[in-house]
Amino acid sequence: MDFMTIFFLIIGFVLLIKGADYLVDGASAVAKRFGIPDIIIGLTVVSMGTSAPELVVSVGSAMQGSTGLVFANVIGSNISNTCLILGVAGLIVPLVVQSTTVKYELPLSILIIPLLFVLSNDAMLWGAQESTLSRIDGFILLTLFVGFLYYVFRSAKNNPDEVEVIDPLPAWKSAIYIVGGIAGLIIGGDWVVSSAKEIATTFGMTERLVGLTVVAVGTSLPELATSVVAAMKRNSDIAIGNVVGSNIFNVLLVLGTSAAIMPTNYELAINFDLYFLMAVSFLLFAFFFVGTLRKESLYTLDRWEAALLLIAIISYFTYIIVNDPGTAAAVG
């Protein structure tokens, strides 16, 4: 590995993030021109755009045979969303969230974790020769995703003020944004996957470790920026809703699409990461309910709780780096 590998990794992340932004802007403007309501655009094009980097990286990894990156990217992104993003945002200002997020969306983001465990662990649970997230599993996840979209659509109809208003663009600019966005996603995704594999090979790291750390944090940068800005503007609902929604999209849409296109082998080592994701998701859920005991029924994430989330992810990263088979062999 040389300097160019790091360069292509960084540029790949930039292309992924900006490509998603341009694709969302262009597609939203086109949809607006066809008279599609803002509520539909916001819940489909805009929402899916935040998960576009994870989707491109996971599908690209599956097609290149890098199965370790497929699951590690999604699970690592959800861990980063929960601990890193909410940890940073919660340190800026205590976060207050709507009751519907705590009662419905957050529990769903927790429940799909054991579902993914059951769908993926064929060898452990059913005695199969290998564990695979099959096309059928992918369609199950996508079906649940459609159901989730329907629920969000119904909820948004009751709260139209919370839906982002889409500004139209000239037709020529929309076309450039769409083409440029797709190109950025494709090229950026390829560079990120290739660079991540090169880093893993050079340092003797497993693809799982690179996916859980470098790739996961990199693809979570849009959510980090959105949530930090929202926290600074005292828009706690956006900060938390952005993270919870992204976690649901990543599992149901990203892994669902990836498996539907290319069935993916599942590594047993990923179970530890699923357990950790489940634990910190429950911890976040508990933090909000602790807030109701102190603050007159407000669901709150205080600064000390945000600090605990940051400590959790630092401890997690330290553990998986020290115990990664590749790094352990290199040290030994």
Question: Model-derived features: where do they sit?
Answer:
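Hydrophobic alpha-helical segments, chiefly the membrane-spanning helices
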Residues: 1-332
